[in-house]
Amino acid sequence: MIKKSEMTKKAIAHGKYIRGSASKVRRVLDQIRGKSYRDALIMLEFMPYRSTDPITKVLRSAVANAEHNLGMEPSSLVISSASADNGPVMKRFRPRAQGRAFSIKKQTCHISISVESAPNQTNTEAQN
């Protein structure tokens, strides 16, 4: 059973209907999951992927939620969970030769990032 003092506060932010496939967003989220807020921002700044811009926006929104709503310090925040789910697909057609048409699928995704305060190392050392 979890005691009330052991429960951690989480701040969550969602980005919905983001243009780009969920699989391409997941490859970036897998690299920043579990990192501190500062380390994640540095990693996102230097990654060569297009999906880093909306991920950065959602991450900053989650940190702003933690700071404003829960009173947490941004320097002590860690990304506890990050996920990307499929959104609706916009279907378009590309005209081709001899009256044919090829379909184009413009994919969207929903990004969810939650942050929580990092566990204090002094408390864990005292328990050992």
Swiss-Prot record:
This protein binds specifically to 23S rRNA; its binding is stimulated by other ribosomal proteins, e.g. L4, L17, and L20. It is important during the early stages of 50S assembly. It makes multiple contacts with different domains of the 23S rRNA in the assembled 50S subunit and ribosome. The globular domain of the protein is located near the polypeptide exit tunnel on the outside of the subunit, while an extended beta-hairpin is found that lines the wall of the exit tunnel in the center of the 70S ribosome. SUPFAM superfamilies: Ribosomal protein L22 (SSF54843). GO terms for molecular function: rRNA binding; structural constituent of ribosome. It holds the Pfam family Ribosomal_L22. One of its GO terms (biological process) is translation. GO terms for cellular component: cytosolic large ribosomal subunit. Gene3D superfamilies: Ribosomal protein L22/L17 (3.90.470.10). This is Large ribosomal subunit protein uL22. Coiled coil: none annotated. Part of the 50S ribosomal subunit. Belongs to the universal ribosomal protein uL22 family.
